Amino acid sequence: MALKLYPIGIQTFEEIINRKLLYIDKTEYVYRMTHGGGKHFFLSRPRRFGKSLLVSTLQSYFEGKKDLFKGLAIEKLETEWTEYPVLHFDMSGGKHMEKEELERYLGYLLQDEEKKWGIDNPKVGSNNRLIDLINTAYEKSGKQVVVLIDEYDAPMLDVAHEKEQLDALRNTMRNFYSPLKYSEAKLRFVFLTGITKFSQLSIFSELNNITNISMNDEYAGICGITKEEMLAQMSDDIDELAKSQELTREETIAELKENYDGYHFSAKSPDVFNPFSLLNCFATKEFGAYWFSSGTPTYLINMMRKFNVAPANLGKMYAKASSFDAPTENMTAITPLLYQSGYLTIKGYDKFSKLYTLDLPNKEIKVGLFESLLPNYLEGMFAQNGDVAIAQMSVLIRHDDMDGALRLLQTFLGTVPYCNVTNHEGHYQQMLFIIFSLLTGYVVDVEVHTPKGRVDIVMLTHTRLYVIELKLDKNAQAALGQINLKNYAQRFALCGLPITKVGINFDSTTGNVEDWVIEE
C-alpha cells in the first residue's frame, strides 16, 4: 500500500493537487459561497485550521484553473469556469510591527500585485494604491475583481489589549480596507479570514452587507476535518495508526476523537477534528499535542492571568453568542478570546433560551492549558520535573494507591521554591485540580454541591470515586471530619463504585502537603 502524503504546513491548493497530497474536499462550500446572493464574506476560525488553504482554493477557482478541480465536488457543479482578476493579500507577515513597519509591509504586498498589472508609479498611501489597483485590474480585464485577504487581523492580534498601539495599527488597517466599500461595483467577490473580530474596522463598520459565516450552520464544516471526512478519506491511515499503536481500529478512532475532535462552530455543527493535529498524528503515528505546542500564544496565558481565570472554571459554561462571538479588544471577560482562538468550543445549544454550552474541545487542549497554567502555582519548576511526577502519580492512582500518590506529591512539592501566593485555601484547591486533571483518564470536578455543602474536589477513576476535602494550616483529620459530618459521600452512593474519602492539610509556610488521612 502506497504511503499517503500529508500536506503538513502546505497551504497552497495548486501545490497540494499537483503533488497529489491528501486534500479534504471542501469545494462544495466554495461553490455554495460563490453562487449565493452575497458578495462580501468573513470567516473566523482558530489558527492552523485550514483558512489559508481555503483562500488558496478560492484563488485557483476564480482564476479558472478547472484542471485542478478534477474529481472534486465542484467539477460537477460549476459549468462556466470564468476567469477573474484576483488580488490576494496575506497579512500573516504583518505581525509584531509598529505603525511605520506595517505601512511598509502593506506597500510590499501592494507592489507584488501592482507589478502584475503594470502599475509603475503607485500613488501615495496604501488605500489610494488599493483603489488604483482595483480600478486598473477592472479596466484591463474587463471583469469584476476578486479580493482575498487572509488573516486580516494578524497585525493587531498581539496588541489587542494595548490601546495606544492598537489604535495606531487599527487606523492603518482601516484605511487599507476602506476601498472595499468604495469599489463595490467593481468587485465580484471579497473574502476575509481571521481569528477574531475587531470593532471599528471598515470591513465591519462600513461594509454593512458583509456576511459573517463563522457561526453559520451551512458552513460549519468548511474548515477542519469532520468525522465523516476522516472515515471516508483516511480509513487506511486509521488502520496503519492502529497497527503502530497496537490498538484495534475502534480503539484508535476513540483515541483520535478524545484527543483531536470536539470542535463545533455553530448550533448544528458536525463534529470537527483539528486538521493540524490529526494530520501530524497520522504522519508520525503518535498521539501528540501538535496544535497546542505549535504556537499557543504567550499573550493568551497572560490574559488568563490578567482575568484571574481559575483553572477549574475553564470547563463547561453557558453563554449567549454575543458574549463569545464578539470583538475582543474591549472584552471584560476571557471567553471571546478563548473561543475564537480555539481553546473553547460549542458543545450544545438551547433554542428556547438561545444559550450555548461552551467547553474545552478535547484532551489536547485540556492537558495543554493545564500544563501551561500549573507553573502559576508552582513557581516555574513544573516544566523541569512536574510532568514526570504527575505521570507517576497517575500510575499509582490507577492501582488505587492514593497514599502513594500523595506521598509522591509531597516529595515533588518539596522541590518547588516557596510561592508567595499560598495564604488561601483556594490556591491549593486549584493547584490540586490541575494536577488531578492531568492524571490520565480521570474525571475531576471542584466545589461539587451536596445537600449539606460543597465538596472541594471529586475525582472519578475507572475503579473508584474519591471525595477530597482540603484544609490549610489545620490538620487532615479535620478535613476528613467535615466529609463525615456533612455526609458528603452519600451524594455519590449510587455511582456504582467504591467511595474513598480523603482529607488533606496544607502548610502555608512551606506550600506543601503537611498530612493526609484516607478512609474507605
Annotate each predicted stretch with a short phrase.
Residues V146, R464-Y466, T500:
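Structural motif
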Residues F176-S183, P336-L344, F433-S437, Q482-V502:
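Metal-dependent nuclease catalytic cores in nucleic-acid-processing enzymes
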Residues T136-S141, I435-H462:
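Active-site metal-binding core of divalent-cation-utilizing nuclease and nuclease-like domains
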Residues R491, C495-E520:
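Domain-level recognition of nuclease-like catalytic cores that cleave nucleotide substrates
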Residues M1-H424, T440:
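Phosphate-binding site recognition
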